[in-house]
Amino acid sequence: MFEPYLTTPLLLKAANTPHHIPKMSRICSDRPSTLVKYGNRVQPFPFPERQWPNKVLKTAPVLFSTDLRDGNQSLPNPMTFEQKLSLYKLLVSIGFKEIEVAYPCANQAEFDFVRHLIETPGLIPEDVLIQVITPCQEETIKRAVESVRGAKQAILFTYLPSSDNYRDTVLKISEDDWVERARWGAAYARSITKDSEDPVVRSTRWTFNFGFEDFANARIGAIIRCTEAVRAEWNPSKDEKMIIGVASSVEASTPNVFADQIECLSGNISNRDTVRLTVHTHNDRGGAVASAELASLAGADRIEGCLFGNGERAGNMDLVVYALNLLTQGIEPGIDLSRLDEIRKVYEDITELPVHPRTPYSGAYYLKAFSGAHQDAISKGLRLRTSATQEGKPCAVWPAWRVPYLPLDPADIGRSLDDVVGINSQSGKGGVAWVVNLGLGLDLPPGLARTFSKAVKERSIHFGREMSSDEVCMAFLEEYQVLRAADKSDDDMIQAVLRTESPLVAALGQVVGLSSLSASITSHTLADDVLSYAAYANVTPEESKPSLWGVGLGVSLQQAKLRAVVSALQVSDGSMSWVRLA
């Protein structure tokens, strides 16, 4: 199958060499034991003086988007200029005030994108701060500064790897040399920005951001030492703070250990009120959001991430999840996600990455319950909340959100109550009744809901899929002949019943006051200009036979009751032909 690609002698030889693939794979697969290979990757970090577990977050940290750089570099097909611009505008519209826009030294397109933002009036609002990123090298720092020339304000971000392993393996320099390189980077950055001889450059309000890659695997003592050197060189103030950034890079520990590291660093930075601490977590172990949340308690001032968790490998921290976690704890996150499905659509179109349907908040199934027990609890909670609002008598828990199995109000992310219940073979009467209530405005009695839910389950099993709300409502109208009955006059109905030989004719007589037979009827008003009443008749034809349900709508309560019994007769007796009434 792959032979056409084996065009060189080397490839041909490799293809014909026995076991050449297993030999390569052993580099990753051979291990004497789990403990030897993976044990002690993260050094113990005893920190008994920790205070973050006792803290409660009261206000949101600044949320910082890295979608245009960290997110973009992780895509199989990087964004075009137009796509980056569309995503940038989306981020601004959502409410992000600090956005990383480019890596100017990467290529000309990155540089040109920054220039376009700065040179196009209105693209950078007065309260939005853009950030450019560069390695800690003279030419690249200079290039980054050139890219934002003329901006009213900008963040210049440079970084160095910080763990002993990375410094020894990749940089091959001592700790002293590493600290000196960081100090030099801060000094050089200041010399060509705040202290530049160019008045145009000096007119920009500069913020310097120095970052530590692989922070989670670094020694805190070394990080503190380097931070002090960088801070002293840049010389920030309370009014013009600098930023110290720490990145887990590859998530290495549990979130509580990361929080200990953050608190230790935060508490040991001199003149802490002149420094903002920003945290950049990754999701390699699945704990990016948890690590960021605990870091917020431990002293982080800014939290970095991408929409929907885009990013290298398992992704950066999901800004949507973090923000809505804040919202559902009563904290305004600072960004507007009230049209989340629209935001997701733009993201998916641009990145070509689908958001998993089970993703917290943004997934298509996040609010949807299929289980009958869950649906019943949701419908009862929503009915209680609705009735409390309509009657003007708030319950003890309102206006607080306390609906079982719904972590937030669907309206807060731009969804409707139609999204909370999915109907399939696992659904129960509560879910089916809720869908009919939303779609048709009918408040089904429990017995009718139970009976109809069985019919719905049979249909779902037959089709082998979920039934849409419209399908459920149409099935209800068909099952109980609701629309046909509503189209006929009372006289036609009476005559139609009298023409049948059904023993249930007397039940109709009871409804209109002509006789007394077994028929239990409930009713309620409708919010409809024409048909103002709905009635539900539970008719028992004979003692030995099960009861039958019918549904009727009418301009009067009497008419609705009449039609409900006729509906039950139609369900029970095939001899009753509506064709003759056409």
Swiss-Prot record:
Gene3D superfamilies: 3.30.160.270, Aldolase class I
A Pfam entry, by short name: HMGL-like
Keywords for this protein: Transferase, Virulence
Domain Pyruvate carboxyltransferase residues, every copy: 61-341
GO biological process: L-leucine biosynthetic process
Induction (free text): Expression is up-regulated more than 10 fold in toxin producing cultures.
EC number: 2.3.3.13
Domain of life: Eukaryota
InterPro entries: AIPM/Hcit_synth_CS, Aldolase_TIM, LeuA-like_post-cat, LeuA_allosteric_dom_sf, PYR_CT
SUPFAM superfamilies xrefs: Aldolase (SSF51569), post-HMGL domain-like (SSF89000)
Reaction(s) the record says it catalyses: 3-methyl-2-oxobutanoate + acetyl-CoA + H2O = (2S)-2-isopropylmalate + CoA + H(+)
Pathway note: Mycotoxin biosynthesis
UniProt GO cellular component terms: mitochondrion
Single annotated GO MF: 2-isopropylmalate synthase activity
Other facts: Gene clusters encoding host-selective toxins (HSTs) are localized on conditionally dispensable chromosomes (CDCs), also called supernumerary chromosomes, where they are present in multiple copies. The CDCs are not essential for saprophytic growth but controls host-selective pathogenicity.
Family in the record: Belongs to the alpha-IPM synthase/homocitrate synthase family. LeuA type 2 subfamily.
Role: Isopropyl malate synthase; part of the gene clusters that mediate the biosynthesis of AM-toxins, host-selective toxins (HSTs) causing Alternaria blotch on apple, a worldwide distributed disease. AM-toxins are cyclic depsipeptides containing the 3 residues 2-hydroxy-isovaleric acid (2-HIV), dehydroalanine, L-alanine which are common for all 3 AM-toxins I to III. The fourth precursor is L-alpha-amino-methoxyphenyl-valeric acid (L-Amv) for AM-toxin I, L-alpha-amino-phenyl-valeric acid (L-Apv) for AM-toxin II, and L-alpha-amino-hydroxyphenyl-valeric acid (L-Ahv) for AM-toxin III.
Name listed for the protein in its UniProt record: Isopropyl malate synthase AMT7
Organism name: Alternaria alternata
Name of the gene encoding the protein in the UniProt record: AMT7
